UniProtKB/Swiss-Prot annotation:
The gene is Cavin3. Residues 20-78 are annotated as: Leucine-zipper. Induction: Up-regulated by 1,2-dithiole-3-thione (D3T). It comes from Rattus norvegicus. This is Caveolae-associated protein 3. GO terms for biological process: circadian regulation of gene expression; cortical actin cytoskeleton organization; negative regulation of fermentation; negative regulation of phosphatidylinositol 3-kinase/protein kinase B signal transduction; positive regulation of ERK1 and ERK2 cascade; regulation of cell growth. Residues 135-203 are annotated as: Interaction with CAV1. Residues 1-84 are annotated as: Interaction with CAVIN1. Regulates the traffic and/or budding of caveolae. Plays a role in caveola formation in a tissue-specific manner. Required for the formation of caveolae in smooth muscle but not in the lung and heart endothelial cells. Regulates the equilibrium between cell surface-associated and cell surface-dissociated caveolae by promoting the rapid release of caveolae from the cell surface. Plays a role in the regulation of the circadian clock. Modulates the period length and phase of circadian gene expression and also regulates expression and interaction of the core clock components PER1/2 and CRY1/2. The keyword Chloroplast does not apply. GO terms for cellular component: caveola; cytoplasm; cytosol; protein-containing complex. The lineage of its organism: Eukaryota, Metazoa, Chordata, Craniata, Vertebrata. Belongs to the CAVIN family.
Amino acid sequence: MGESALEPGPVPGAPAGGPVHAVTVVTLLEKLATMLEALRERQGGLAERQGGLAGSVRRIQSGLGALSRSHDTTSNTLAQLLAKAERVGSHADAAQERAVHRAAQVQRLEANHGLLVARGKLHVLLFKEETEIPARAFQKAPELLGPEDQLVLGPEQPEDEVGESSDEEPVESRAQRLRRTGLQKVQSLKRAFSSRKGSEAAQPTPVKPPRLGPVRNSEGPAEGQPAAQPAMEPVLPSALEPEPPQPTKEDPERPVLQIESAA
């Protein structure tokens, strides 16, 4: 009777095959605990992996940002290099044009030089801008000489002086030669003007007596002509003498004085 009292009764919901022991329940609970622990470990590993992935993503993002910044800087440098290349190209074109222009000028100069050398008229003078004509070029002026002396000494005097000073001072000898030739031209113009004035002054004198002759005397032009001939004789030497200071005859000489100052 005691054994029947100790036996457990039927568990509600238990299989009808037999009673469930406590050992099986414990083993099941242990298995469940081990499974939960493994799940937790897996979740922790997944969390760690997720954190590593997040860090790698951040690093990738930072690398992409640095790459974008470097790309911007490279694009800016490329733009600057392109602008510099364009400027250099424009400068190179301008330099090439200048070189072509200078080459053309050099060719023209060489052609002109060849022509001058072929003609034998090449004269090279080295001078300063503010050079003065020496004073001795103005000392011996042919103004005080007479017309006959000038005709005799005119062509010889410049050649002698040029021959003496051509070896030492070529620039001064040329200035002297130019000065003396200018003075000779001025003197020739003076002589031409004086001869013209003498002829113009001699013409009215023989004309006036025949006009007055018939009014005063009715004897004829035979007596008027000899009276006009002695009047011409004193006039001709006066044409060779220095010109009288008359106001009407000084006006043509004014350009002659200007020619002397310019020479």
